[in-house]
Structure formats: structure tokens, C-alpha cells
């Protein structure tokens, strides 16, 4: 029966485990628990008296499972009825008999399911059934032991003596006997619930004041097989009494149990005597020692205990009879000889193998039996490993040694072999990696049969000495868009004029403006290299920490298919068009950039680090950037000086410095003079093409203003003036603003977006972009009060008029028809006075 609710009460001390945890160890099994489970499957046959051995197969299935995990099981069976438990056994026997009679009656009535339930409750495990399991287990070399009385006390003794390391059972009484480790509710796969005595302190209900003795007292007070509990006393109240009581005399505590619980409980004298008997039964119940082969009490008797008075805990018999009972040779009820098994003369049984190395273990199977003369209990795993370690590993506190690993071949990870470098990069090669790279696709010349090599000549400034170094960087050709090339050639042959403004920017390739550039710039050029003027600025060209970088780039674009390799800048090349792109550069000292570049398309121009929306001047996509696309409509002037756009950039920079620094007058004067000189030399066609030049906004962290460049007012203006409005720096990254295309800038400004109406279209198809277009800085800017439309403004526009229109007073009496006609807004007030409406009036007033 066990102790009601004990497992739930101490669930904190339980732990789910698998039985393989005890591999190589010995466990004891309460076999009657397996017998009861196995008998349920054949309860109907057992009730009818029909022969069956299904319960034997059920038990052996668990035995084989333990053997397969390398665990040695010892099957323990119940023996004679304990005198202190005769009343309990008699009541159980009467209950089983009543269920058996009821089941037979229900079976006669045809109620099979209800009869089967009654047969299940009437199962009685006899010694004959246990003997069948003993024979089946011995055939496989499994030790079996029949307890002189109860199997619980015998199992507890085996665990305390160290013969077994754990106990497999379904009865919670084992904890009251003082077992150290108990495995409960184990299934056929080996999963179970382990309760360790050392973990009982983890139970919050028990606390840290509980001992093994108090735990046993609690189990007895809550009700056990040897004594029923008082009315209204369970585990919780029994635990509360023992936690509050400090008196070591348990008899006095029981007499004052009503005082501790504040209950009106009268404790009879018979209950106190029954408590003492139950406690002595848990302590001194007789068990069989398989090593000494005699009956002994579970615990040694104390000095004040008389063994003669403990007859209720078991009566002594002769040791030879006790041995025969333990071996299963005698019936526990009649003491008749039913078997002649002798462990000393019996041949070792050969159990079936469970793994490939089981043969080595079968040789010592007889020696490992508990019935062998030389058998000694296996010490616990903790004591085996601790004792030698203390001797072999002395303390190393305060000991210092110098350890050398020179002679040791330590395992290490294989080192990753780096790729050997043929030669280190020079400073010029390193600088060329950070410069703008351009490519030119090689094309086949049908007339000459030779190929022109793609090259890019880059003049890199020397930051130390000052003179420029010329480098030729060869890059692999880039694959062009075949479909775009085909459409371009088709448009050129048909003579169609393609306006870039009417094309979709999503499907426009990098070379889609070649035909336009060929028609615009048709004059030969005398020079293909442009030298920029020196800039006396105090910012670094490479890697300023504030993120400011302005690069001056002059791109010479040749739209022809072939350019000879021996071309000299001074030669005259007919039918060629060259497009230049300007950039500004800052350096620590004065520097010059001279580039002679012949890329196939403008789409291949991109910087080394092209950040999206950042400092890069070229797009990541093959489509041309806005500034590059518009530069193809400009033509180079004959003067060897820089282009006007470069001057525009210089002037803008000088004007931005003019507001903050008053000491830069020489620079401004020099820039303005150069601007006026070069503007005068600008030709008519050059001025027409420069109408579409672009204004690039420069960045800074200190100033904020708008950038607005008004180039020309109308197409008919043939002068080459460049009207420059205020130039300043924004707190946003550098962007290329394209006239006619409104690009979304970064959300760094808190001002609202103001869109001006578009003006008249230009000849190129692109409209001029409004001067000041600002975006909201944050995505949450629409929640600001200044940017929201209030309800009052909406009601002003859509509200109803309060004052209704009143008809002017008249001297004539009102007419119910004439004066109730509401005039429409289109009708005139004197509609009735017109002669052409007289017929209508007569029809109305008649």
C-alpha cells in the first residue's frame, strides 16, 4: 500500500533518470510489483484457475532490459506474513475474495468488462507464481532471494549493506526504511524516477531540520501499513508537528499533537503503543543476510531494546530453514520442500548474450553471485575513486615549478599557410588603388584588323615632393549591354533624335547618350589632357575623419570605336567627341591632377569606394550618374585652361569661405579673375551646351544653407555668362542634383518639402530644378505641430456658411411661386425682367 501521497510530497527530491545510469552496478528489484503488473494482463485466467505464464514473461522482459544495459539485478520476493501486519493482510484478503465473487457474478450476467475489473482487484500473488519466476530467472543466471518476511525490509538491508546500489520498486515504504536510492515507476524502456536520500533537504516542506528519524516519524503519523493515522492527520500536519516540536521524546510530542496543531484531538493510549510497535518494525524487522546466511535485524539492537519483546517484527527460526526459505526451496506458508536448489553445487547458468563482449563476463558469473562463498559487496563508486586519489595526488599548495615544453610534441592546429607574395606593393601602386579607375572595351577594327588596348593614364600627385607621377593602369574590358548597343546603332542609322529627358531612367544604359553627344560635339579637339589649377586648401585628399572628400576629375571621353595607342594630345582627331567631368580635390599641399582617360562608356566611371548617397561621385549601377550624363553635352574650349565648371566649383568654394574667413581675399580675387578670363574665351556652342551644367552641393558640419545655381534663363541667350547665386555647405552627404529629376535626399533636415511648379521645358527635355528643396530629417517629422494640418483649417475650407442669403426687400407683395424660385449661380437676378423670358413668366404665373 505504501504511504499515501508521499511521492507528491517530496517531488522536489525526485529526478527523472534512465536505468543505464547504474551500468556495471547491482540493483535490487521488488519483484512482487512486477508480478502484480504482469498478472493484470491475465487476471481473467487467474480468476478462473486456468494455467498461464504471461506474468513470467512480463517479469523476464524487465530482467532482460536490465541485463542489456549491463546491470546485475537481484530479484527479491515477499516471505511470510509479518505478525504486526496480520490485520492488514486479513482485510486485504477479504477484499480480494469479495471482488472475486463479484466478478464471477458479473460474468454470469454477461457483463464482461465489469467482471474483468473485479478480477483485476482480486489478484492474489501466490508463492507458486513467484516460484515460476524464480526458476526462469535462475536459468539466466539472475540471483533470487526470498525475504523471511517483507521484501521492503530485505531490500533496505541490501542497500544499506552496500550489496546493491539502488532499489527498483513501486512502494514508497522503502524511504521510511532508510533506503539511500530508490527508483520508482520504471517502465519497460528503463525510464524512471529516482529519489535520493541526500536530496530530501531540497523539499521545502521538510526544511533543513529533518533527519532520517524525523522522516520515519512523519511517515508513521501520516499512516502506514503498520499503523493507521489519527483522524485529520496527514503528511502536511505531521510534518508541521515535527517542525514545531523540539522535544526528542516522540511519545510526549504525540500526546501534545493537538496543542501544536491547535486542534481538539484526543490521542488514545493504544495509538501510542501502536506507534512504538510500528517504529520498532521499521527499525528491527528481521532480514536474511546472504553473505553470513543467517537471520539478522535490519538495524542493530540498541541497549535498551529487548529482542524478546519484538516478536511482532519477526520471529527467529533456524538459520538452515531461513536459508532454504531464502533460496525458494520451501513454501513460506507450509514450510514444505518444493525445490532442491543448492548454490554451492549448482552449475553456472549461461545467459544469452546481449552484446559482442558478453562472453568475457560469463566466466565470472558464478563468482559475482551473492550466494557464492567468496562474494564481497561492491564498494560504492565514490569510495573507490576517492581513496587512491588522496594518496597519489598530494597537495600542490605553495609548490612552484618551471615547466618547459621544448621536448613535448603537443597537438596543435595546422597553421594556415598564407599565399606567398612575389613582391611588396610600392607606394605608387598603393595610391593607384585608391584613385578612380576607368576601363575601355577593346573593339575590332575591320579595316586595319588590329585591336586597340584599353588603358587609363592616371596622373597621381606626389604628396611629398609636388611633381605629378604618370601611371598607366590596365583594367579588363567590361561587357557592354548588347541590346542597348543594338538600339543605339539602329537610332544612329535612322537618324532619329533621342532626347534623354524622355527616356526611362530605369532602362537607360550607360551608353544611351552617345548619339546625342556625337551630334552635339562634332568639332575636333586639339588636346585631350586638361590640367587643373592648384588648390590651396587645408584638407586631406585620402581619408579625412570628418568624412569630407572632394575629388577633381577630368574625364576625356572619346566616342569613336578606335583610338590609336600612339595618339598624342596635340594631334587633330576628326569626328571625335570628348566629354570632361570635373571634380574638386583637397590635399595637404598644392597638387595637380592630369588624367587622359578613354573609357568606352560613362557608366564605367566609378570610384574605388562608391558609397550609396555618400561621397562617391559615381553610381554603383551601370546607368550613368546624373552629373556624368549631363557632362556629355559640354564641349571643350580651345584654351588650355580649365573648364568653366571647374571655375564654378572654385568660386563656390571661395564664396563659402568668404562668409567665415576674412583673410582669403587673394584667393577670391585670383579665382574671379580666372573665371572672367575663361568665360570670355568660351565659344557660342560651348555656352549652349553649358546650360545643362550641374551644381554639386558641398558638405560641411559647421554651416547650413541652400545651394542654388542658376545657369541661363532661356535657350535663345547666346552669351556664356554663368550667373552664380549663393554657394554654401549643407549638413548632408554630397549628391549630384540633376535638373528636372527630383531625387529624394537623405532625411537629415527637419524642414518640410516645398515643391515649386515646374517651369517651361528646356531644349534638352530637362526642366530646371527648384532652388531650395528640403526634406524632412526624421521619419517621424509629420507628427510635429508645425507640419500638421489642424482641424480648424479644414473646417474653414469645408464648413457651412452660418448666414443664409436673404432676398432683398421689395414693395410688391411676395408671390408663393415667384419668390420661392431659387436662382442658380449661373442665372442672373433680373431673369424675370428680360423680354425673351416673358413667355416663361406667363406660363409660371398663370
UniProtKB/Swiss-Prot annotation:
Motif annotated as Nuclear localization signal, chain positions: 418-421
Tissue: Highly expressed in bone marrow, testis and thymus. Expressed at lower levels in colon, lymph nodes, ovary, placenta, prostate, small intestine, spleen and stomach.
Posttranslational mods: Phosphorylated upon DNA damage and in response to agents stalling DNA replication, probably by ATM or ATR. Phosphorylation at Ser-454, Thr-621 and Ser-714 is induced upon DNA-damage caused by treatment with hydroxyurea (HU) but not upon IR treatment. The HU-induced EXO1 triple phosphorylation facilitates destabilization/degradation of the protein.
N-domain: region residues: 1-99
Effect of residue 410 to R: Abrogates exonuclease activity
PROSITE patterns in the record: XPG_1 (PS00841), XPG_2 (PS00842)
Outcome when changing residue 770 to L: Reduces interaction with MSH2; abrogates interaction with MSH2
Result after altering residue 714 to A: No rescue of HU-induced degradation and loss of HU-induced increase of phosphorylation. No rescue of HU-induced degradation. No rescue of HU-induced degradation. Loss of HU-sensitivity and resistance to HU-induced degradation
Function: 5'->3' double-stranded DNA exonuclease which may also possess a cryptic 3'->5' double-stranded DNA exonuclease activity. Functions in DNA mismatch repair (MMR) to excise mismatch-containing DNA tracts directed by strand breaks located either 5' or 3' to the mismatch. Also exhibits endonuclease activity against 5'-overhanging flap structures similar to those generated by displacement synthesis when DNA polymerase encounters the 5'-end of a downstream Okazaki fragment. Required for somatic hypermutation (SHM) and class switch recombination (CSR) of immunoglobulin genes.
Complex and partners: Interacts with the MLH1-PMS2 heterodimer via MLH1. Interacts with MSH3. Interacts with the MSH2-MSH6 heterodimer via MSH2, and this interaction may increase the processivity of the 5'->3' exonuclease activity. Interacts with PCNA, and this interaction may both stimulate the cryptic 3'->5' exonuclease activity and suppress the 5'->3' exonuclease activity. Interacts with WRN, and this interaction stimulates both the 5'->3' exonuclease activity and cleavage of 5'-overhanging flap structures. Interacts with RECQL/RECQ1, and this interaction stimulates cleavage of 5'-overhanging flap structures.
Protein known as: Exonuclease 1
Protein species of origin: Homo sapiens
Gene behind this protein: EXO1
